[in-house]
Each structure stands twice: as C-alpha cells, then as structure tokens.
Amino acid sequence: MSFDVGKDKLYIQDVTLRDGMHAIRHMYGIDHVRAIAQALDEAGVDAIEVAHGDGLNGASFNYGFGAHTDWEWLEAVADVLTRSVLTTLILPGVGTVDELRRAYDIGVRSVRVATHCTEADVSKQHIGIARDLGMDVSGFLMMSHMIEPEALAQQALLMESYGAQCVYVTDSGGALDMDGVRARFQAYDRVLRPETQRGMHAHHNLSLGVANSIVAAQQGAVRIDASLAGMGAGAGNAPLEVFIAAVDRKGWNHGCDVNALMDAAEDLVRPLQDRPVRVDRETLALGYAGVYSSFLRHAEKAAADYGLDTRTILVELGRRKMVGGQEDMIVDVALDLVRERGAAA
C-alpha cells in the first residue's frame, strides 16, 4: 500500500453516466450527459466514466438498448471536458478491442476492464491492448463478495500481471460490509505491488456505500467510484456528494466542490429518475441476497409480467448464484417460481 489517505489526494471517479445508465434503462439524452459531465468537470471530479451500463457495446436484447450509442454519448462528453479524464468500461466478450480503439480515437484515455471476480484471465488481451494504446488501465473484479479475500487477491494479481495499473474491489451486489471490504484490501496488500493502485466500487443496497468507500480509502484505495445522487444500479452507488461531504469533514484531500456536487445531484440527476434510486424492499433484497445490482429493473418487469414478488425472484437468483450476463435467466427463474406456485396450489 503506497497511498496514505491522510496525506495523498483521492482519485474521484464518477460513474453517473455509466452505472447510472442502469437506473434509467440506458435512456440518457445527449443534453443530459453533456450537462452532467460539464457540472462534474467544473466540480473537480478526476474522471468521468461514460458508456452503456454494461460497458462498450452493451446495447443488446439481453442487457437492454440505449437511447443513444456509446459513441454519441462519448462524443458529447468529450466536447465539454476541460480537466476530467474521459473514462469508459469494457467487458471482454461484450466489447471487443475494436470498440476499445474507437473509444480511444474519440478521446477516452482511461478504461476499466471488467470481469466476474473469478474470470480475470479473460481480461488479458483487453488490458494489454489498452496499455499499448497508452491508456490508463484498471482491472474491475465484479461481484467481489462472491469469493474469499485471498482468492480475489489472486485474481487481482492476474490483472496486475497483464498490465493493470489499478485493481478494484467491485461490490456489484452491494453485499459487502466494512469488515469484508477491509479483508479484501488487506489480501490485496499481501500480493500486489505497492505501486499498483487499489480502487473501490461500492453499491448502496445495504446503505453501506459511503462507509465501505471510507474504509477502502483507509486501507489504501486511492480510487473511489461514486455517482451523483447515487445514480446507479439497484440502490445506486456510493452517492458522490455524500461521500465528498463525509471525507471533507475528515480533512481528506479530494479536490472537489461539495456544494457544486450537491447542486448537480439535486438539479440535474434526481429529476431523471423514473424509479427512485434508494434503499427500499426490492433494492435491499439485492444486498441481502448478494445479487447483481443491475438485475433490479429486469426482475421488477418479470415480477409484474408473472404476478410475483420481486423479492422472491431476487432471492432465488441469489440462491442460484446468478451473475452479470445472465439477465436472460431472470424470466426462466420467474417461470420456475410460477410453476412451483401452481404445484403448491
């Protein structure tokens, strides 16, 4: 661990325009992304991630189609940034190296290469090509709660060996608590080089997004993901304006204007939420069952279509250990539950 939270500046990575896509079914308009990005840039955020919620080339029947293409969103944001680093996310197998090169041509200079927490080996080509392009590259180990800290650290070590300059603990299910976060970063410290940065991507399904991010920073995570008004899958990400307010009270160096972030969250982002991004019975079920946060809207639709309780579907998905990319199985699970209900009648 080379980062000292008491002395060094945090790297604030906003995800409103990528993870936040899930909250509104990838329906951001061009004017929306431009206004939000400009506000974030002016507020001093270090980097702004832009893509379909499931990364470059994520638009599909499985994940959902967006109001615009990745390229339209990225070009709109690239036009307004003056200091924040334009960032994107790519899932190997969903996005190809061709998409990575095209993103670079638009102006993307930082990328997070995301895999399920046990599948770091599929990130090798994407990390290598991103490094060859001269990009800043982070490894993004999704659903980090699903394996033990030492096993996660071995996956992080693979990403480091491929060239990742930072590796994340990615709590996609919002299922980790502070002890779980601490244990995972301590495991990282035992195997990763000190110069390899650590990052934290929290979800707020158990209302621990801010607390987990603070603990991560105390354990050496320099890069912290957050979003305006928590705009993200499930109960959202760590709310950016709340995290900055909390660490500002601690005297940590974050470089952001907290009032500007509050204004952007309230005036630009919250009005776009067709479903409130908050902890409620459905989003709490995500964290409780350890389910991928972006399953929420899919599960709610299946519940409405088949007369089920969303929580019942989510808990069953958790029991079956479904992971990102298996959105098409949500309807199958719902049909199984309908059959079981009929058999019991």
Swiss-Prot record:
Annotated Mn(2+) binding sites: D19, H201, H203
Protein name, per record: 4-hydroxy-2-oxovalerate aldolase 2
EC numbers on record: 4.1.3.39
Domain Pyruvate carboxyltransferase: 10-262
Alphabetical list of Gene3D superfamilies matching this protein: 1.10.8.60, Aldolase class I (3.20.20.70)
InterPro entries: 2-IPM_HCS-like, 4OH_2_O-val_aldolase, Aldolase_TIM, DmpG_comm, DRE_TIM_HOA, PYR_CT
MF-aspect GO terms: 2-isopropylmalate synthase activity; 4-hydroxy-2-oxovalerate aldolase activity; manganese ion binding
Active site residues per record: H22
One Gene Ontology biological process: L-leucine biosynthetic process
Family: Belongs to the 4-hydroxy-2-oxovalerate aldolase family.
